[in-house]
């Protein structure tokens, strides 16, 4: 599942950084999605970026970033309804992206809501974020770094175990 894939990727990155004696830089998926949205869309005015990852049913993992990718609203799990983000939408345009945004399009109806489809972050989109972290010396401890899960990771054994 996604937890296992994330743990494998983090373990590989930690091993490479340790072996090559290079710093480990973590890039949050939602921040990366916001960055990719900025690179692939062009808005002259001051907008907010709200990347969303589908968390099943009407729940999404989300955060809100400004044009400089500063967090305006922290990462959170959110059940989306018609009043979600109303405070932000009242003041300015908000660009929603990611697979979680697609299911929210019919629920969040506001003239300041912009839904952008088909934003898939690429490794090249990560460069600006990694460079900023490098310049600011924001490195992770290779020995103790753990993936950031919004929900608690619970390891289970499959019910239908086939031998």
Which positions does each model-derived feature cover?
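Surface "functional belts" at beta-alpha junctions
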Residues: 23-121, 149, 154-155, 159
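Short intrinsically disordered, low-complexity coil segments enriched in acidic
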Residues: 1-7, 55, 62
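Acyltransferase
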Residues: 116-163
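DPxDG-like acidic metal-binding loop motif
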Residues: 2-29
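A residue-level signal for conserved active-site and pocket-lining positions in enzyme catalytic cores
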Residues: 1, 16, 96, 127, ...
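Active-site catalytic microenvironments for nucleophilic, acid-base chemistry
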Residues: 19, 36-40, 129-136
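Short, basic and Ser/Thr-rich N-terminal targeting/leader segments
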Residues: 18, 58, 143-144
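Catalytic-loop motifs flanking and including active-site residues across diverse enzymes
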Residues: 8-12, 81, 122-126
């Amino acid at each position: 599942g996604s937890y296992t894939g994330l743990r494998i990727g983090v373990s590989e990155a930690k091993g490479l950084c340790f072996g090559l004696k290079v710093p480990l830089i973590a890039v949050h998926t939602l921040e990366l999605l916001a960055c990719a949205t900025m690179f692939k869309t062009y808005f002259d005015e001051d907008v907010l970026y709200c990347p969303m990852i589908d968390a099943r049913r009407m729940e999404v993992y989300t955060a809100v970033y400004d044009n400089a990718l500063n967090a305006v609203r922290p990462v959170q799990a959110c059940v989306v309804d018609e009043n979600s983000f109303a405070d932000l939408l009242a003041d300015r345009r908000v660009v929603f992206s990611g697979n979680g945004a697609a299911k929210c399009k019919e629920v969040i109806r506001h003239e300041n809501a912009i839904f952008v489809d088909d934003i898939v972050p690429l490794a090249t989109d990560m460069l600006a974020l990694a460079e900023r972290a490098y310049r600011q010396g924001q490195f992770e401890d290779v020995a103790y770094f753990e993936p950031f899960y919004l929900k608690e990771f619970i390891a289970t054994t499959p019910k239908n175990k086939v031998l």
